[in-house]
Amino acid sequence: MTLPIACSLTDAALQERRRDVLQKFRNAVIETRESKDGYSYQLPPTEEWLTELANLMNLERQCCPFLRLSITVEPNNGPFWLELTGPPGTKEFLTTTFN
């Protein structure tokens, strides 16, 4: 079964929350790295951002079930990286949604 490359949120409150979280995310991104199947985003290594990333990942798995999401926490208080990848079409979706 192929999942569509589209947001599937229908509840207005969830959509609004996602917009708020995404705006905060965009403002906090330190660096973006392109990969074959998506992007990785570097974020500040704070407790607040670890919580925000978990929040964002939860919203995205409800909204975009085609996404593969992972967080890398670098050692020695290094940065956090959120990696988003998926099937063909994912990069284009991420470019319009996250970048």
Short names for language-model regions:
Residues 58-67, 98-99:
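A common structural junction motif
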Residues 42-47, 82-86:
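Short beta-strand-to-loop capping motifs
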Residues 48-54, 89-94:
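Short, conserved charged micro-motifs
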Residues 29-30, 66-71:
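A short linear hydrophobic-aromatic micro-motif
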